[in-house]
């Protein structure tokens, strides 16, 4: 109280002419003195302080609110965010240094309901997020979207920024600040517990599965764990689901999931982008580039790839051409739920990629390991690359990657490996190479053989994880006769890329004595080139990604010119018949003729090889369906050549060229010999009398489908326009004459089934011509089923295609008149007579 008494004494001794107003002001000044008063009261002084206390600063208030909550105790975990659990609520402490830092947020199923169609480990949501300070009381969470960019030194940068607002996905009240480090405390319980666009099921998934609103009372935040670079959140979420197309959910009216959400801090400085080149097949993120010196906008894409760099001390060695180990190895872990006998083969499939990375200058760049017994590690953690084993009847596997949207740097991969992929592998192997490898001819493949097949699929899926797209054109770079050359094919493989769907060498014949090195796919020359192109490190050689792009483009041109086998043919969805799924060689007509020799042998022996105990025929039925499917693949490979064109490397002299006439003629000859001459061998009685196939219907459907392509109005229009553009092209009337010759053959009275199918084929043919002359619907504007380029209905309708069809109808009529006069068999004669009547109706259709 000494300070207070001294102050009053000074006031008493002041001159008496001081006014009352001045005295009042002095007393107010006294009331502002706080430290000693507070200390005294805090020590239990009995005198009551009636003076007005000063208002606390916002910083003091936040510190007080923080202390008030923290003194309750509870759980504390330090990491990227300090995670706290107090009572039944969860909190983050967010450092100011993490504001506006990008966070990868990935939510995966930890457990999944039965018959949901997705499995534990599969991704259900992915976002890139960042916290932003709205004001001192509020943090907002935004989702980062990156579709257009501009250099910050350009004037247009401001316009681009103002037109690229990122959506707010959550808002958090700031409870207080940690007085020591100034971290902001926010409650996150409801954010993770409730449904939202960041950590919940996506709207499309809920719509597809008929999942309703979240049931809050039956949803929980189970755990939050903090690590230096990430936070892992485990939740249990229950949704209403009535009615639902998920049987169990429909019965109880609800469906529950355990989810794991990984929040991972992305690099402060993004990896330098590598810009996409359409001549090398990488997954890529597309963006629109704006700049002040443009006269039109520019679309660019940057590829997805892991950050693979030499250690600082090895940079000079690397740049001088020595192989070095990367600073950070690419590591994949094997799901411990994987059957033990298959784990080593999955590991081998991953490690096989090292041969490609050596072309990029790195040794031991990639490795697969068994999952360690470490409680601090989680399979769902987005920091780890994992091959997840999924208990599913689906016969497949897939290898996605998740990349930093700013740079394309791959952050993590979770391969989905369905248990039943082994069924597909067994079917492929038996049907395609069962004629040359006796090990395939069993109900169950031996472990070593199945392991080899798993290994190649593992390599294929890891290729996707590394950023590689399918290259369906790869197999077309192998000359067909080399596939039967034992020395050559065992040295080089039957395709230049593991990323093609070129399963096994079905061209090899039993007498060729080709071993498994010439039957299995492997990482080939294209794969090595693609990894070299995408992963070679250049240090500071280039100023930015655009300078690098210019240099790499020149290198790519040189390499492709020197070695055309490095051609990237795309995903197999275009019109180029060289880039198809499941095909082999530079001539599929020849390749598939060899393949059918093998398939005939396999089909003729299936009933012996697939014998089951207790006279069951499940395996026989399944394998026969696979054989028919394979036959149709061979057929469709051939049909794709009709009305299509080759699409070459961008920048070459001729990018687009019609498929040569000689090749199309080969295709027609194949269809004539292998389909229009009905393939009754595909349905031996030893099989059909056990599984009940409708032989005539199945073959008739195949024949009709082929005619739908060969006489499709868009296909004919393409041939017509090609003939106008080039004197070497296949003339439309010549093409129709060749197809006619394949269909309109004399009926052989001794072959009852062949006769019946041939009559049906001819009726179908005439119906297609009728459709061309008297179209019931406008020609489609979409690509036809053969993949040929689309044409508008107006263009087709206004062309000469209908005139050619009318001219062709007269040719059919002339043939029928002669045939009916020469035919003695009553049913065949009546067939010709009826077709002539149909032609009259076609020429003069009823209104």
Positions of predicted regions on the chain:
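Sec-exported extracytoplasmic/periplasmic mature domains
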Residues: 351-362, 463-464, 468, 504, ...
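Solvent-exposed, acidic/flexible segments
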Residues: 339-346, 447-455, 492, 624, ...
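Extended catalytic-interface subdomain
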Residues: 403, 409-417, 458-466, 508-509, ...
């Amino acid at each position: 109280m000494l300070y207070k008494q001294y102050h009053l004494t000074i006031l008493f001794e002041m001159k008496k002419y001081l006014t009352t107003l001045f005295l009042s002001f002095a007393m107010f000044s006294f009331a502002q003195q706080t430290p000693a008063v507070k200390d005294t009261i805090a020590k239990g002084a009995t005198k009551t302080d009636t003076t007005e206390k000063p208002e606390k600063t916002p910083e003091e208030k936040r510190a007080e609110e923080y202390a008030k909550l923290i003194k309750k105790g509870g759980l504390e975990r330090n990491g990227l965010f300090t995670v706290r659990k107090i009572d039944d609520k969860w909190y983050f402490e967010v450092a100011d240094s993490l504001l506006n830092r990008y966070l990868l947020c990935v939510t995966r199923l930890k457990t999944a309901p039965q018959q949901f169609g997705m499995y534990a480990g599969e991704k259900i949501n992915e976002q890139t997020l960042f916290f932003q300070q709205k004001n001192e009381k509020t943090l907002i969470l935004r989702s980062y979207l990156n579709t257009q960019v501009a250099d910050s030194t350009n004037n247009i940068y401001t316009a681009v920024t103002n037109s690229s607002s990122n959506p707010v996905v959550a808002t958090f009240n700031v409870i207080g600040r940690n007085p020591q480090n100034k971290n902001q405390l926010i409650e996150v319980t409801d954010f993770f517990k409730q449904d939202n666009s960041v950590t919940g099921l996506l709207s499309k998934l809920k719509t597809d599965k008929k999942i309703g609103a979240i049931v809050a009372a039956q949803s929980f935040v189970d755990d939050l764990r903090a690590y230096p670079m990430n936070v892992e959140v485990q939740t249990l979420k229950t949704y209403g689901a009535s009615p639902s197309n998920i049987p169990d959910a429909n019965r109880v009216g609800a469906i529950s999931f355990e989810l794991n959400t990984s929040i991972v801090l992305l690099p402060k400085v993004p990896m330098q982008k590598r810009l996409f080149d359409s001549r090398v097949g990488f997954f890529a993120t597309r963006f629109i580039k704006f700049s002040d010196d443009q006269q039109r906008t520019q679309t660019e894409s940057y590829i997805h790839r892991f950050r693979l760099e030499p250690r600082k001390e090895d940079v000079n060695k690397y740049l001088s051409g020595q192989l070095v180990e990367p600073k950070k190895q690419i590591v994949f872990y094997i799901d411990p739920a994987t059957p033990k006998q298959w784990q080593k083969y999955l590991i081998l499939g991953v490690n096989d990629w090292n041969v490609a990375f050596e072309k990029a200058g790195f040794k031991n760049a990639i490795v697969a390991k068994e999952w360690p017994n470490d409680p601090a590690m989680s399979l769902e953690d987005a920091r780890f690359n994992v091959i997840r084993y999924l208990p599913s009847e689906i016969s497949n596997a897939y290898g996605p990657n998740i990349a930093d949207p700013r740079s394309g740097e791959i952050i993590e991969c979770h391969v989905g490996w369905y248990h039943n992929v082994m069924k597909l592998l067994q079917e492929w192997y038996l049907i395609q190479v069962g004629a040359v490898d006796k090990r395939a001819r069993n109900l169950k493949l031996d472990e070593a053989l199945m392991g080899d097949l798993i290994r190649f699929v593992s390599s294929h899926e890891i290729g996707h994880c590394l950023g590689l797209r399918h290259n369906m054109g790869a197999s077309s770079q192998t000359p067909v006769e080399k596939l039967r050359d034992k020395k050559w094919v065992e040295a080089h493989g039957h395709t230049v890329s593991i990323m093609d769907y070129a399963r096994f060498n079905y061209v090899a014949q039993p007498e060729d004595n080709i071993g498994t090195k010439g039957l299995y796919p492997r990482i080939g020359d294209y794969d090595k080139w693609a990894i070299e192109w995408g992963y070679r490190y250049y240090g500071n050689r280039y100023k930015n990604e655009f300078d690098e792009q210019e240099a790499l483009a020149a290198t790519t041109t040189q390499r492709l010119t020197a070695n055309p086998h490095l051609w990237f043919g795309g995903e197999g969805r275009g019109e180029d018949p060289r880039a198809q799924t499941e095909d082999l060689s530079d001539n599929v007509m020849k390749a598939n003729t060899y393949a059918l020799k093998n398939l005939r042998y396999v089909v003729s022996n299936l009933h012996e090889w697939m014998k089951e105990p207790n006279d069951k025929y499940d395996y026989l039925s399944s394998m026969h369906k696979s054989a028919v499917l394979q036959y149709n693949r061979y057929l469709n490979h051939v049909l794709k050549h009709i009305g299509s064109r080759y699409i070459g490397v961008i920048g070459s002299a001729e990018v687009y060229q019609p498929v040569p006439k000689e090749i199309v003629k080969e295709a027609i000859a194949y269809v004539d010999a292998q389909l229009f001459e009905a393939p009754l061998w595909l349905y031996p009685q030893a099989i059909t009398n056990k599984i009940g196939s409708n032989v005539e219907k199945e073959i008739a459907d195949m024949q009709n489908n082929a005619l739908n392509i060969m006489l499709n109005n868009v296909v004919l229009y393409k041939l017509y326009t090609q003939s106008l553009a080039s004197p070497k092209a296949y003339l439309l009337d010549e093409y129709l004459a060749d197809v006619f010759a394949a269909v309109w053959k004399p009926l052989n009275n001794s072959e009852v089934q062949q006769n019946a199918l041939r009559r049906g084929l001819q009726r179908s043919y005439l119906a297609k011509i009728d459709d061309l002359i008297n179209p019931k619907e406008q020609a489609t504007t979409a690509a036809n089923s053969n993949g040929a380029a689309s044409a508008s209905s107006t263009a087709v309708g206004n062309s000469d295609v209908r005139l050619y069809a009318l001219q062709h109808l007269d040719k059919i009529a002339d043939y029928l008149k002669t045939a009916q006069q020469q035919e003695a068999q009553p049913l065949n004669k009546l067939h010709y007579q009826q077709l002539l009547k149909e032609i009259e109706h076609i020429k003069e259709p009823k209104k």
